[in-house]
Amino acid sequence: FRDLELVKKELQFFLDHKVPQVKFVDRTFNCKHDHAMTIWQYIKDHDNGITNFHFEISADLLRENELELMSTMRPGLIQLEIGVQSTNPDTIRAIHRTMDFPKLAGIVNRIHSFKNIHQHLDLIAGLPYEDYDSFHRSFNDVYALRPQQLQLGFLKVLKGSHMKEMTEEYGIVHKELEPYEVLGTRWLPYEDILKLKMVESMVELYYNSGQFQNTIACVEPLFEDAFTLYEKLGQFYEKKGYSEISHSRMRRYEILLEFVKEELEEQSAGKSGNQDPEVENPAGKAAEDCRGMETATWEKVADSMIYDLYLRENLKSHPSFEYDQKPYEKAVWEYRRQEKVPKTAHIEVFRDGKILLFDYENRDPLLHNAAVKEIQI
């Protein structure tokens, strides 16, 4: 391990120059607890309010004093990358890892409760004993932890690695050029790799971007599970030819709404006599889905999209799926005048009757979303 006094000097250099982000390259930064604790304490004590430090850790190795220290840090001071790779016990054993997933899940949830740390969790496709169904389960296990980023990677069969040695036994086929990415295994044929590539793309666009958080929470109950949502969304992109074209942010919303409409119609067709497509939330997550509504309809999804859009920015042009604001313009103008609402803020009337004020001068320090409050006009 690098001398701690030298590390402190180097850290101070970054802090003095207000470097936006510093990444530690240790694969398991917290394997030596005293070393990790000293560094975390130093960056907390010398926080410049700007620099973010990225660490790759094993969450199930974190100790109580480390968690307590993390809970006191400035939002955004550190972010954690946690390599789960798989939740299949046979897979974990085959890659010579030890991981207590229930313990890891508990710690990830605890860190979530601090509301000050970005967590990035990863899964690796192409590992031994992990077929498509097993990866499906691993995905749902990790997705349920709601990390800020869920990174789907594909096995790299590096020269000299254990996976390279086991190529024949595991039936691994990989690219001949760097980074030697897996193309198939005994358990996961090339066709399934391609399907997972599409899932990865959808997760990157609609989950990891953070731009569709409330919309995705609203849409999820329409599907058997989270993996199925992204799988079907990817299939929709391919069917419509959308995967071959680059799209604007607004177009991504329109495509998702188009997808939801088709899904609602298909589900409605399977229910005799249902003229108004409405799907009950099987998980009963009323507080989380559709901004407090227990059912998903096209209108509620559209409202969730408007909410997500205005959380990020005060739109210059109105989306095609926005609720008509014209009947409320006079009342909104009068409210702005009386309450001296700054021009930078936005007021939106939703289909459910709620009126929300988006304050862009006060943003969430971790997610950078606008502060929101309900008003009466």
Tell where the protein language model's regions lie, with residue ranges.
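Radical SAM enzyme core and accessory elements
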Residues: 201-377
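Mobile, glycine- and charge-enriched loop segments
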Residues: 105-131
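Short, hinge-like loop/turn segments at secondary-structure boundaries
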Residues: 40-41, 138, 167-170
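Radical SAM [4Fe-4S] cluster-binding motif and immediate context
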Residues: 1-113
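Catalytic cores of alpha/beta
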Residues: 65-70, 129-146
